[in-house]
């Protein structure tokens, strides 16, 4: 039972959402696609009953992350509310591209990148000296925000220049438009952001118990107009700036070792651009008289320039899988997209299910790897193969692109054709082979 001061769940179908996803009955993976889409819709149907939500959308790469909560490839708009669970623990997971032109071979760039990047849990050794790249301004902002501790500052220092594991990658390819060699990194805010997320979920839980006990714990929110909300919003901006720097550190190290001048005095030129795809964005209400709206994208690429204060020519990156090109797209808010595009190819099944199906063929992991990476220079940082990150683990890339076009989810203006990529690899092997 709710009291008059509490917010109950909305009635089913009270707030609808845009369904930018379909199932191809002719697809060889039809059974898994259909099950995945049904699960996404079931989760969204329940999620949209959350009392703060006023709009939502799902992208072609959508896949569920649990019952009645936002799927990967989901976008929801909340009134005066920041939902930590809707951007997940990997706050500001993002992609950055640097165009190195045609002076360096793709292999050279990939070799150099492998020598300077870092995958796996935790951060770098202090002796590596990467922590010195943390700017004084960022350090001061971290120290001044009450949501961060001395331990968080340490993570902000030691996790700089690291990429983590899972689906994070370092990709090298060539522009389809003119042949320039491009480096793309994909990762988030690492332990620094995860620590903030854990605190925010606890704060949101306290508000949920008072404001809306019927709301599921994973969908709890922090009222944006409270002191907690204001501090959290500022903390999110700090994490965003740190994550951008995290990408830049890796790109700078590669450029320095190549002798490239794409970074001048450590500052990126127009050769570099980036975008997040796990974040929350703020905008005024439709008529300007109501409370601010907070647009949450979990695995969704913001197209609208109003979401990105540092947009470069409106360009965005949509990676698919290691064997497919990374799409360079542009777009605007439309009646179908809420200002977003997919963030990648997405999955039709869990990692465990994919591994079981692939291994049921009787092939070894090495044989599966050799078959799926033919023609690309795919590397695992740990040396241990992780078949759950091979192309077959993801949705059909062509179908995702077709649905992007069909639903008006951005326009492809270039493709970065794959030469090769680096991913973390087998978790046990990552820890065993850590050197920096």
Show where each model-derived region lies.
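N-terminal glycine-rich flavin-associated loop
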Residues: 97
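Acidic, low-complexity central loop/insert segments
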Residues: 100-102
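Domain-length cofactor-binding catalytic modules of enzymes
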Residues: 2-44, 51-59, 64-72, 76-88, ...
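Acidic low-complexity segments
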Residues: 118-147
């Amino acid at each position: 039972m709710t009291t008059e001061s509490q917010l109950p769940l909305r009635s089913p179908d009270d707030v609808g959402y845009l369904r930018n996803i379909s199932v191809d009955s002719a697809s060889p993976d039809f059974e898994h696609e259909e099950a995945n889409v049904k699960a996404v819709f079931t989760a969204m149907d329940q999620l949209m009953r959350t009392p703060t939500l006023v709009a939502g959308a799902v992208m072609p790469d959508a896949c569920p992350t649990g019952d009645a909560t936002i799927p990967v490839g989901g976008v929801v708009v909340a009134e005066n509310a920041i939902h930590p669970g809707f951007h997940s623990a990997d706050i500001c997971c993002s992609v950055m591209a640097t165009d190195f032109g045609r002076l360096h071979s793709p292999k050279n760039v990939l070799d150099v990148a492998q020598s300077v990047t870092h995958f796996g849990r935790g951060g770098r050794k202090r002796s590596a000296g990467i922590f010195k790249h943390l700017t004084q301004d960022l350090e001061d902002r971290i120290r001044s925000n009450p949501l961060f501790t001395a331990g968080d500052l340490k993570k902000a220092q030691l996790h700089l220049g690291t990429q983590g594991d899972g689906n994070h990658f370092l990709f090298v390819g060539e522009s389809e438009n003119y042949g320039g060699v491009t480096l793309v990194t994909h990762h988030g805010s690492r332990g620094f952001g995860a620590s903030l997320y854990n605190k925010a979920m606890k704060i949101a839980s306290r508000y949920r118990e008072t404001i809306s006990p019927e709301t599921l714990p994973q969908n709890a929110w922090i009222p944006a107009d409270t002191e907690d909300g204001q501090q959290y919003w500022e903390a999110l901006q700090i994490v965003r700036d740190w994550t951008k720097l995290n990408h830049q550190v890796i790109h700078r190290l590669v450029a320095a070792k190549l002798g490239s001048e794409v970074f001048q005095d450590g500052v990126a030129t127009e050769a570099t651009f980036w975008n997040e795809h796990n974040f929350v964005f703020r905008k005024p209400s439709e008529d300007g008289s109501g409370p601010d709206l907070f647009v949450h994208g979990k695995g969704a690429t913001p197209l609208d320039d109003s979401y990105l204060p540092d947009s470069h020519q409106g360009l965005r990156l949509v990676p698919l899988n290691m064997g497919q090109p990374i799409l360079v797209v542009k777009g605007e808010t439309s009646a179908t997209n809420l200002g977003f595009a997919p963030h990648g190819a997405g999955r039709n099944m869990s990692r465990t299910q994919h591994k079981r199906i692939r291994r049921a063929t009787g092939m070894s992991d090495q044989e599966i790897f050799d078959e799926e990476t033919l023609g690309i220079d795919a590397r695992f940082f740990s040396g241990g193969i992780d078949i759950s990150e091979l192309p077959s683990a993801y949705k059909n890339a062509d179908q995702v692109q077709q649905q992007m076009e069909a639903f008006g989810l951005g326009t492809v203006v270039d493709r970065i054709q794959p030469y090769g990529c680096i991913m973390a690899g087998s978790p046990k092997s990552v820890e065993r082979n850590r050197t920096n």
